[in-house]
Amino acid sequence: MSTINTDTNEAMPHISVNAQYIKDLSLENPSAPSSLAALDQRPQIDLSLDINITNLSEENFYEVELNIEATARNEKYKLFHIELKYAGVFNLINIDSEQHPILLSVHCPAMIFPFARKIISSCTQDAGFQPLMIDPIDFGALYHKKMSEHQN
């Protein structure tokens, strides 16, 4: 029989997800019901994503918020516009503060993104459209691009 030494586990560096939640959700279906009859062609999807990081009052606690907006259009209609602010509260335990920016910009968003993606998929489907399946996002590439833009 093995036992787990919790003292050692508590000293190990790790990220704890304390909460996940929808902060804001809006879906517009402005041309319904006419737009629902025009679903025989693939719409153009415009997608934007932003990450906001807030240092909370408790030490090493942060809120990481994904802001996702998507608009679908065809040649005749604006089919839908969806906005989602989805956030998580993270505790960075026994992690050097120099590593916090990359963890908060890459690893934490990657942890909550699948949940935000599912919400968007479900909402667009419930609005009468094919579910919007957002491709996986390389948060590491976004972080490095943003860092190189700040250096220039």
Swiss-Prot record:
Biological processes annotated in GO: protein folding; protein tetramerization; protein transport
Subunit structure as annotated in this protein's UniProt entry: Homotetramer, a dimer of dimers. One homotetramer interacts with 1 SecA dimer.
GO cellular component, one term: cytoplasm
Acetylation listed as a keyword: no
Gene from which this protein is expressed: secB
Main subcellular location: cytoplasm
Function: One of the proteins required for the normal export of preproteins out of the cell cytoplasm. It is a molecular chaperone that binds to a subset of precursor proteins, maintaining them in a translocation-competent state. It also specifically binds to its receptor SecA.
Lineage: Bacteria, Pseudomonadati, Pseudomonadota, Alphaproteobacteria, Rickettsiales
Similarity comment: Belongs to the SecB family.
Keywords, sorted A to Z: Chaperone, Cytoplasm, Protein transport, Translocation, Transport
Subcellular location field: Cytoplasm
Domain of life: Bacteria
Organism of this sequence: Rickettsia akari (strain Hartford)
Pfam families: SecB
Annotated InterPro entries: SecB, SecB-like_sf
Identification of the protein by name: Protein-export protein SecB
Recorded GO MF terms: unfolded protein binding
